[in-house]
Amino acid sequence: MARTALKVKAKRKPKFKVREYNRCPICGRPRAFLRKYGICRICFREKALAGELPGVRKASW
């Protein structure tokens, strides 16, 4: 889990646009962020397996 200070820091508008970075709103993880869904890979997997993401299915071939 990310520190609360880092979560708050990421939400603030930076002085320069290039300093902005994505962070998972659920757990605060800055890496492995999926832009399409707006969450990190770990939270994505948990939500997908729980059926909370519409249109997402486990791959099978």
UniProtKB/Swiss-Prot annotation:
Gene3D superfamilies per record: 30s Ribosomal Protein S14, Chain N
Cofactor-binding details, from the entry: Binds 1 zinc ion per subunit.
InterPro entries: Ribosomal_uS14, Ribosomal_uS14_bact, Ribosomal_uS14_sf
Chain sites annotated for binding Zn(2+): 24, 27, 40, 43
Name of a matching Pfam family: Ribosomal_S14
Cofactor: Zn(2+)
UniProt keyword annotations, A-Z: Metal-binding, Ribonucleoprotein, Ribosomal protein, RNA-binding, rRNA-binding, Zinc
GO MF annotations in UniProt: rRNA binding; structural constituent of ribosome; zinc ion binding
GO CC terms, sorted: cytoplasm; small ribosomal subunit
Family: Belongs to the universal ribosomal protein uS14 family. Zinc-binding uS14 subfamily.
Function: Binds 16S rRNA, required for the assembly of 30S particles and may also be responsible for determining the conformation of the 16S rRNA at the A site.
Protein name: Small ribosomal subunit protein uS14
Organism from which the protein derives: Maridesulfovibrio salexigens (strain ATCC 14822 / DSM 2638 / NCIMB 8403 / VKM B-1763) (Desulfovibrio salexigens)
